[in-house]
């Protein structure tokens, strides 16, 4: 049997349903994330995702999306049902999903192992390491995508609700 909502409950429900309509969750690399050289992390991430010239594609975003899409859809659906039932707010659902999705993208970045780095890239990393520049946030010096950890640590989310 359907539950009838009266008074303040209906006003709250209308407000939350309106906020769902206007809500937005963005996950990825934002303008504030830049390398010390000033190069946007999003630019470097897109080169790694799709490849460019001599740099082979090392996709991490699309594999994460493909692997998690059904789970994300189920989680959004159950979250918005909880909003409709008055258990949580739209912003809470989107914040929770943003944290989860950004963590899964970071995991995807960390799991990339191929194509292997060129020997010249590994040599350049070793030179930087011996010159005192921070290198290797996770894994070995020869692991793709995680030399400094900047890209990995720049995955973030924004909620507009």
Q: Which residues does each predicted region cover?
A:
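Short, Lys/Arg-rich flexible segments
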Residues: 1-161
């Amino acid at each position: 049997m359907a539950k009838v909502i009266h008074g303040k409950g209906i006003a709250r429900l209308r407000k939350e349903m309106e906020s769902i309509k206007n809500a937005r969750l963005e996950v990825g690399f934002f303008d504030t994330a830049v390398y010390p050289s000033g190069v946007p992390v999003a630019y470097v991430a897109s080169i790694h995702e799709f490849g460019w010239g001599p740099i082979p594609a090392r996709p991490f975003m699309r594999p994460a999306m493909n692997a998690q899409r059904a789970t994300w859809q189920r989680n959004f659906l159950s979250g918005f049902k909880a909003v409709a039932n008055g258990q949580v707010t739209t912003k809470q659902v989107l914040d929770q999903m943003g944290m989860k999705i950004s963590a899964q993208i970071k995991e995807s970045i960390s799991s990339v192992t191929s194509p292997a780095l060129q020997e010249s890239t590994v040599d350049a990393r070793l030179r930087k390491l011996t010159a005192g520049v921070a290198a290797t946030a996770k894994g070995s010096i020869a692991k793709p995508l995680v030399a400094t950890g900047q890209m990995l640590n720049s995955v973030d989310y924004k909620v507009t609700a």
